[in-house]
Curated annotation (Swiss-Prot):
It comes from Caenorhabditis elegans. Residues 113-123 have a biased composition (Basic and acidic residues). Its main location: cytoplasm. Residues 42-54, 530-541 have a biased composition (Low complexity). The gene is sas-4. This is Spindle assembly abnormal protein 4.
């Protein structure tokens, strides 16, 4: 029956669904609801193809083999759609290759367009208001025209031939409507489909017109000779099978709906309509030889009559019924196989879906179990923590209650006792508390002592760490200094080599080799012996390249030459430093000198009748005009050297190492940079050697070759005298001592409590007879920065004037 699923909410007709609904059989096609037509409506056979579509059955060939199962046939259902069963519209069950008839093998049946119509009379008698019509359209209607359905101009000649024949048979059907009253004879074997009682659930159908020659009798048909041959009969796809209680009626209706297969593959005997008695008499009078000739007024097609046909036996009728039964059974078997395949696939799909759902449920169950375990574990841990806390609170409260109870009991006992006993107990309690207090104070004192010891250890460790850091910095600075010194020495060596080569060339060109007169030496600036490099190469070169008087005498020179004749080309003018320009400097007005090698020197006149030389490599030298004081400061290794040529005394300060005081007679005083000791080595005129050492821990040690080492403790303010008490060492403190001598005074003291700014001050006493001022040189031992000043007394006041300063 047709459903209302194609009718929209607004009453409009929706497009029909091209697919079967879930659960419908393969042979149950969609049957549209067919309303009762009006009296003036055209018959069904005359409707257009849009309202009553027809199909073109394709011609089958030997290549179309029977499938193993109905599911393997292309039913037009998408593989992705698992909810729709396959149809049998394209099943090649009726292939002519499987038929036993030789005519079917030679002449395969062409495509036939089949349409079914209704009779208005039977529709009023046998149908209800809602009747279903079986259409030849396949259950699957593709979106685009299929290759199996062709237009009229694309049909073959055979198809057009059979199409015209079908139109003629439709005309015969209309003429046969008047003869239905004659078909009143019925038997228990079969009933014509046109005369069978109608069922409200199934539409009335008509027999399919026979396509064979009407003149061929039943004797000309090739019937199967055995059941094996009968089982091989090819079948065509059936239309919707009606359901009925009578098996014979069901077989007849099924046969009526499989007319295409009967037209295409085999002939069936022509069953004539029953004749009236007068007609039978008239037919018997005719010539029996013309029994096969049809009358023109006789219709070309009549309905099957399940009665005893004259001229045929009962076995032939039974055989025909058996053939139809087997055919219908084969059709039912095919549909059953299709339904079973679809059911199996549905079960498999449902099973897979259920397995997936079960797997998801199991996974969800596992997750819930894990989450439950975690929650349970967390709750247990939280419960244990709360229980422990409650237990601790309970124990604490219980102890407090016990103490309170003891106190109450003690108070009750005290109240029961007398005043004397009470005072006695109070005295004992006070004594006990005092003992506890003393013990606590003792422990606190011990703790303070331990803390003090620990602090001292930490302080020592900090000092050691600081010392190591300073040593590391000093080593780094020394390394840098040595690198710079090596670079400077290489440069000086190259320059000296060039100078030697130049002066050697000059010496080879001399006309005489007499000694240079003293006047030439006086024109050269004074050269002071020091550890620093000489800035006057001319003087060193003159000393180096002086030769004996007979070394460079020319061959052509006679003995009559004057011995005092000499050449002034010994020192060329280009090797002497000549003044270039004058400009103001940071210490006063200065003059810049330059030699032929490109070396420059800056000379500045300072107070105290001195000259300050600033060289291009950063070195500084200060010399007074009397040549009594010569101070040289090296920029590379930060060495400070003070020479007193008049007294033959030198004071050398090596950065981060020590201070040396060199006196005549190889008397040396060494002061370590960390002030660990002050060591003085003395050599007397009689050859006696003596060493005096002032340690930082307050010990005074004397050593010599003849006597044992003597060590004693000295007190601050101690004086040690020598050289008739004109020279001595004044020790004011461990970090403050002074070397007092007639020519100078050198004081070493600690600049701040940390000991990071230790300084020494050298005071050079000026000679009054030479109008010299006292010089004061202050040097920082940590940074090697210093200042040179003049100090003089004006009345009761001391006045200082800065000559120059130097920094890193």
């Amino acid at each position: 029956m047709a459903s209302d699923e194609n009718i929209g909410a607004d009453g409009e007709q929706k497009p029909s669904r091209p697919f079967l609904r879930k659960g419908q059989g393969t042979a149950r096609f969609r049957m549209p609801r067919n309303n009762k037509t009006s009296a003036g409506a055209p018959p069904t056979s005359e409707l257009s193809s849009a309202s009553s579509p027809s199909i073109n059955v394709p011609r089958f060939s030997l290549s179309n083999a029977l499938p193993n199962s109905a599911r393997t046939v292309d039913s037009g259902i998408s593989n992705e759609d698992e909810t729709r069963p396959p149809t049998t519209a394209s099943l090649p069950m009726d292939q002519p290759s499987l038929s036993s008839s030789p005519e079917n093998r030679l002449n395969p049946a062409p495509s036939v367009a089949e349409e079914h119509g209704h009779s208005g009379q039977h529709a009023e008698e046998e149908e209800d208001n809602d009747t279903d019509e079986v259409s030849a359209m396949p259950s699957f209607v593709p979106d685009e025209p299929s290759t199996l359905v062709n237009s009229d101009h694309e049909l073959s000649d055979d198809a057009l031939k059979y199409k015209n024949a079908a139109a003629e048979f439709k005309a015969f059907e209309r003429r046969m409507d008047s003869m239905r009253s004659a078909s009143t004879i019925t038997t228990s074997l079969a009933t014509p489909s046109s005369c069978a009682p109608s069922n409200s659930s199934e539409p009335p159908t008509r027999s399919t017109p026979i396509m064979n020659d009407l003149g061929v009798g039943p004797n000309n048909h090739n019937w199967p000779s055995s059941m094996q041959e009968l089982s091989g009969i090819s079948l065509e796809t059936p239309q919707a099978r009606p359901l009925g209680s009578n098996r014979i009626n069901q077989l007849v209706r099924s046969e009526a709906q499989t007319g295409i297969s009967l037209l295409q593959h085999h002939e069936r005997p022509t069953v004539t309509a029953p004749l009236r008695r007068n007609d039978m008499m008239n037919s018997s009078r005719q010539n029996p030889q013309n029994g096969n000739v049809q009358d023109e007024n006789r219709p070309e097609h009549v309905y099957d009559q399940p009665i005893h046909v004259p001229g045929s036996s009962l076995d032939r009728q039974k055989l025909e019924i058996e053939i139809r039964r087997h055919r219908n059974l084969n059709i039912q078997l095919r549909d059953t196989i299709a339904h079973l395949d679809y059911a199996e696939e549905s079960v498999h799909t449902t099973k897979r879906q259920l397995e997936e759902k079960i797997s998801e449920v199991n996974n969800f169950k596992k997750e819930l179990i894990e989450e439950f375990k975690k929650c349970k574990k967390g709750v247990e841990e939280e419960f244990e923590k709360k229980f422990e806390k409650i237990k601790e609170d309970y124990d604490e409260l219980y102890e407090k209650l016990k103490r309170d109870q003891r106190d109450l009991e003690r108070d009750q006992k005290i109240l029961k006792k007398g005043t004397g006993e009470r005072n006695k107990e109070f005295t004992e309690t006070i004594a006990t508390l005092r003992d506890k207090l003393r013990a606590s104070e003792t422990k606190n004192a011990q703790y303070r002592q331990d803390i003090r010891v620990r602090d001292e250890k930490l302080k020592k460790k900090d000092e050691e760490i600081e010392k190591l850091q300073k040593d590391g910095n000093r080593l780094k600075s020394t390394l840098q200094t040595l690198e710079k010194r090596v670079k400077q020495l290489r440069t000086e060596k190259e320059r000296d080599d060039k100078e030697k080569e130049m002066f050697a060339k000059v010496a080879m060109n001399r006309k005489t080799s007499n000694p240079v007169p003293p006047v030439l030496n006086q024109s050269v600036p004074i050269s002071i012996t020091s550890n620093g490099p000489s800035r006057h190469p001319s003087s060193s070169s003159l000393t180096t390249f002086r030769k004996p008087s007979t070394s460079n005498r020319e061959r052509g020179v006679s003995w009559a030459d004057e011995p005092n004749e000499q050449s002034l080309e010994a020192v060329p003018q280009e090797f002497l430093m000549m003044p270039v320009k004058e400009m103001p400097g940071k210490f006063g007005k200065c003059t810049i000198y330059r030699d032929s090698l490109g070396e420059t020197s800056k000379v500045t006149d300072t107070i105290a009748n001195g000259l300050l030389f600033e060289y291009s490599n950063g070195d500084l030298r200060w010399v007074n005009r009397q040549n009594a004081v010569n101070i040289y400061i090296s920029a590379v290794d930060k060495t400070v050297r003070i020479d007193l040529p008049t007294y033959n005394i030198s004071i050398i300060h090596t950065f981060q190492r020590q201070v040396e005081v060199l006196r005549p007679g190889n008397n040396i005083t060494l002061i370590s940079i960390k002030r660990r000791e002050v060591r003085t080595d003395l050599i007397y005129q009689n050859g006696m050697y003596k060493t005096e050492i002032f340690n930082r821990d307050g010990r005074y040690v004397t050593k010599d070759f003849s006597n044992q080492e003597v060590s004693r403790k000295y007190n601050p303010g101690t004086h040690t005298y020598r050289d008739n008490q004109c020279r001595y060492v004044l020790v004011t403190d461990y970090n403050d001592f002074e070397l007092v001598e007639p020519e100078f005074r050198l004081r070493w003291y600690q600049g701040d409590p940390t000991g990071l700014n230790n300084q020494y001050i050298l005071k050079i006493i000026g000679r009054p007879e030479c109008s010299e001022k006292t010089l004061r040189l202050e040097v920082n031992l940590s940074t090697c920065e210093g200042t040179l000043e003049t100090a003089e007394m004006i009345g009761d006041k001391r006045r200082k004037t800065t000559l120059f300063q130097w920094k890193k």
